[in-house]
Amino acid sequence: MRVAFMSSVCPKMTVAELLAAAKKHGYQGIEFRPEWKHPHGVELEATAQVRKAVRRQMADAKIESCCIAPSIAFNFEDRAECDRRLDRLFQYIDLAADTATPRIRVFGDPLPNGGAGRRSNNYTQQAEYLSKAAARAAEAGVRLCLEVHGTMRGVDAGEVLYRAAYPPALWINWHLIHCLNHGEDIDEAYRHVKGRVGHAHFSIGTGEQDTFDALARQAELLAGEGFDGFFSVEHINPPDSDATLAMHAEAWRRILAGLKR
């Protein structure tokens, strides 16, 4: 297992500056958040030259571009909107391939909760669109990671993958805090995502021992199944980017040390 951070932790940094920060604190990957005007340039509008340059910078630094995290989801009842999102996701798959980024995060929330089969229908619709996207992603050597986020709990993400018939390029981004915030404990959530976790987001705060203990348990469960992906720090526009990176890097070292005991 490896540790990364999202560009939202350092929203004013270029690729070169992100790489310097990663090296300073011992991070092995960087997750690029497009669409938020970060100066890293990993965007759909990036030229072939920019894409090639990013790929070369990451390779030279021996730090992985581990994920691209756009705001793409297929939970809309308007299928025309889903069609537009699918076309956009296809473009992100090309961007990921061009920058040697093996994962793309996608959303699946908010889920409808109005009865009359709306949630079940939404599962099926998301599975349909994600299956189409996963077929394209597989051709490009990219994995799509449906994030456990908001009302998309572990049980919900697991159901979408089940209805999609588990395509090889469709995985889960297990952001544990969203499970805990919606009444789904660690081991309960794990039963629904086991064997299909391709990526994980995490964040902790100073003194939040409960959060640290939950993260340590999540890491223990994933280590037990041989997970070799990234735990990526998601913190949006913190007041002190360097301190945030340092704190999470230290927490990650403690977690790895605990796994070795």
Where are these regions (language model features)?
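Hydrophobic faces of well-ordered beta-strands that scaffold small-molecule active sites
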Residues: 3-7, 30-32, 65-70, 104-106, ...
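C-terminal helical cap(s) of enzyme catalytic domains, especially alpha/beta-barrels
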Residues: 242-261
